[in-house]
Swiss-Prot record:
Residue ranges annotated for the 4Fe-4S ferredoxin-type domain, each copy included: 2-30
Official protein name in the record: Ferredoxin-like protein in nif region
InterPro entries found in the cross-reference section: 4Fe4S_Fe-S-bd, 4Fe4S_Fe_S_CS
Residues bound to [4Fe-4S] cluster 2: 20, 39, 42, 51
Organism annotation: Rhizobium leguminosarum bv. trifolii
Keyword Iron-sulfur listed: yes
Lineage: Bacteria, Pseudomonadati, Pseudomonadota, Alphaproteobacteria, Hyphomicrobiales
Record-listed [4Fe-4S] cluster 1 binding positions: 10, 13, 16, 55
Amino acid sequence: MAFKIIASQCTQCGACEFECPSGAISFKTDRFVVDPKICTECRIEFDAPKCRAICPMPNTCVPA
């Protein structure tokens, strides 16, 4: 499984893109998106998903 970003809640601060260790988050057209083929949910590198931890808005970066 991968994560997704709820666009209607996203402030577009870009913190998640910068923090993502796998480079799965990018800005496309008018929103940040997570590429499910690249997203590792930070399982190997960290105890929790970095996008979820860094996001200033609760429940914006969620399991897909």
